[in-house]
Structures are given as C-alpha cells and as structure tokens.
Design a protein with these regions (language model features):
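C-terminal motif of bacterial Sec signal peptides marking the signal peptidase cleavage site
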Residues: 16-19
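A residue-level marker of the well-folded mature domains of exported/periplasmic proteins
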Residues: 23-394
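Positively charged n-region of N-terminal signal peptides that target proteins for export
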Residues: 1-9
C-alpha cells in the first residue's frame, strides 16, 4: 500500500508537468532503461517508479519501455546500451555513477540516439557529444530536511534524559562527493536543532548490500550512536536498528533511511527517508525526445520543482516535527535557507570563503554569496569537503 501511495504521488507530479503531446510516431517510440539493480533495491525501485510515472504521463504502452536489470558498472553497460538501440530505443537512461564511460562509448557510435546518465559528472560538460546528458536531483535539500527530523528526535531524547551524548551515525556506500554531500547536508540539518551533535560515518564500499549495511548499523550502535542515517540502498540498516529495538539491545536508537519509506521494515524506529522524485526528470526527458525538441544537457531540480521530498513521518518522530519540516522547506523554496551556508560549518576551525573544484572544472569557484552552490556548476554533487564534527571510520 505504501508503495502504491508513493507511486501515486510521483504520477500526480508527472502529470503536473503536462502530458506528452501525441504525434504520429508515438506508437513506435521506445525507451531503454539500464538499471544497476532491480525492484528489490530501493534506489533502483525509485527510478522504476519514475519511469512508470513518465510512461503513463506520456501515453506509452508498457512494451515501449525496455528494461535492463542488474547491469554492473563495466562493459555490460555498453553492451546493454547497444542492445537497446538495436531494439529501436530512441532514448536510453542509465542510473548508476559507474555507467557513464560506457554510455559515452555507446553515444559516440549512435549519434541519433539520446543517452541520459544519472549522477554523472562528465558527460554533459566534458565531451563534444550532443546526444549525451546528465541528470540528478537536489537530493541534498531533502537530506537536510531529514536531518531536521533527526535533530528534533535527538533533542527530544536529550531533553527527557533518555540520552546525554548527541552522537549520530551514518551508513555510507563510498567516500564519493555524492555521499559526502548527502551526509553533510543531513548533519547540518541535525545541527540546526542540536548544535553540539557530532557524527561518525561507516562505509560499506557497496551501493547495495543488506548484510554489510546491517553490520555497519550494528557497529555504529555499539559506538553509541542514537540516530543513524544512510546513503546506501538497502533496508539493512533500518532492519538492524529495528531488531536491536525489539530485543532490547538498543531500545532508543532511530533510523533515517533513503529512497523508500522504511516503515514496513522498521515501524518503531524509522523517522523518515529523503526521496528522489525521478518522475520529474523522466517525464521531461521522454516528452522532449518525443517532440523532437532540444533537451537540457545537465538537469537538476529540488523542492521548488517537486523533484525531492521526504517520506511520511514515523510515529517515533518528536512532537512538532511536521511543523518544523514545513517551515524549513518553505525557507529552502524561497531562498532564505541555503543548505551549505558557510556560516554554519567550519573546516579545521575556519569558515570557508572560497573553494575551487577539480573533476575537470579547475578554477571554478563554488562558494559565493556566503554559501557553497551545490549542483549548480554541474547537476552531480561536488561537495566533498570534510567539515568539523564528522569523522569517517572507514
């Protein structure tokens, strides 16, 4: 039921972008989708929801969408892309960071096909190809809001004497900018409520691994963490936290998930999850391709365009959380609040006033007007700064 509700929200948002204009070639239009996982993995499931919302909004039949599941970040991606083109796909999407170079390879060989890559950093800006595109959401905004949810709970636990140490944990997949940006936004959201909070990050070095994510959560609980967020794609961490709650080992530890509502697996401890509304992009891209119009080469939108959100609040959330969340989202939308406001964090005890990013963008200043302009130079996150108050464990 929760998955249906989530899909309904994405679908409604997709229709709001406007249904695709019919044309004589619509019945022949095919869409290829290369996925790093399948419906059992939260990140990929969110992309599947977005594609399905776009399919309905654009009036396509199910057999006009061709999926390639569990495609690793290697030559298999190139082979999948070629096969999709040979099956008649006019636009091909790939949803994992490591797919990019293989998608570029295919784009060079098939200039009349559009290739769109999620989370990429180079395709749209560092090639002369006109048929390669990057896309992401401003998920850091939703991660900040989820941090506010966590901070409200942490404050409640401290105010009532349940805990005395504002120790937070985070299960991260890899030490990439995407993950660093996300956990920093989450942490800053927490600190906006509990300024003394500090956080430890445990890496799994896998995007999706139930066992490793559960082990990371258990290790963080053993270290005294009372709120645990994640940028990893399974239900492993919330499930482990729920199990520790049920057996009394750690009855007062709470979870903030990612991608999907975690209340099904962690009903007593799940607070919320930051979520991408991928349907916003997929509807835009498919509609634009079908109409033969020029497509934005590097796309990123957030709360103001309904491309991100947090899931429903769990029953364990602190009183007043809904009101706090609404206020923060309003501030993000009207530009009053910037997630990476440099006055809210330090690096080695100093506030940053300048930061030049590499990744082929040497000399590009990312800090002006007092904050780091995430996902503005390119759609993919570039914030890889290790700020004070956060420790990476490995």
């Amino acid at each position: 039921m929760k998955k249906f509700v989530a899909f309904a929200l994405v679908l409604a948002m997709a229709f709001a972008l406007c249904a695709c204009t019919p044309n004589e070639d619509k019945d022949d239009f095919k869409v290829g989708v290369i996925l790093v996982g399948d419906e059992n993995e939260g990140y990929t499931y969110a992309h599947m929801e977005g594609i399905e919302a776009a399919r309905v909004a654009c009036g396509l039949e199910k057999d006009q969408i061709i999926y390639k599941y569990n495609i690793e970040e290697n030559e298999a991606c190139y082979q999948a892309a070629v096969d999709l083109v040979e099956q008649g796909c006019k636009i091909v999407f790939a949803n994992s960071f490591g797919h990019e170079s293989f998608l570029i390879q295919a784009a060079k060989e098939y200039p009349d096909v559009l290739f769109c890559h999620a989370t990429g950093q180079t395709a749209a800006k560092q090639t002369d190809l006109k048929n390669i595109f990057n896309y992401f959401t401003a998920i850091y905004e939703a991660r900040y809001v989820s941090g506010v949810v966590a901070g409200m709970k942490l404050k409640e636990l401290m105010d009532n004497g349940t805990v005395t140490d504002p120790h937070v944990g985070y299960v991260g997949a890899y030490p990439y900018a995407e993950v660093v940006s996300g956990y920093t936004a989450f942490f800053l959201g927490i600190q906006s409520i509990v300024p003394d909070a500090y956080m430890e990050v445990q890496y799994t070095n896998k995007w999706f691994d139930l066992t490793l994510e559960a082990e990371a959560a258990n290790a963080l609980m053993a270290r005294g963490c009372v709120i645990i967020g994640q940028h990893a794609d399974s239900t492993g961490a919330p499930s482990a936290i729920q199990a520790a709650h049920d057996d009394g080992t750690y009855p007062n530890v709470y979870s903030v998930g990612y991608n999907i509502d975690m209340l099904n697996v962690a009903p007593d401890v799940a607070l919320t999850s930051p979520q991408n509304n991928w349907g916003a992009y997929y509807t835009y891209a498919i509609k634009t391709a079908m109409e033969g119009k020029e497509m934005q080469q590097d796309w990123c939108y957030g709360y103001i365009d309904e491309a991100v959100q947090i899931s429903q609040l769990g029953t364990a959330c602190a009183e007043g959380t809904q009101e706090a969340v609404a206020a923060v989202i309003d501030k993000i939308k009207n530009g009053e609040l910037h997630v990476f406001d440099c006055s809210t964090f330090t690096v080695n005890g100093e506030h940053l006033t300048s930061y030049d990013k590499s990744y082929g963008f040497e000399g590009t200043e990312l800090i002006w007007d007092g904050y780091f302009h995430e996902s503005e130079v390119i759609s993919a996150p570039l914030f890889d700064i290790r700020i004070d108050g956060i420790t990476e464990l490995g």
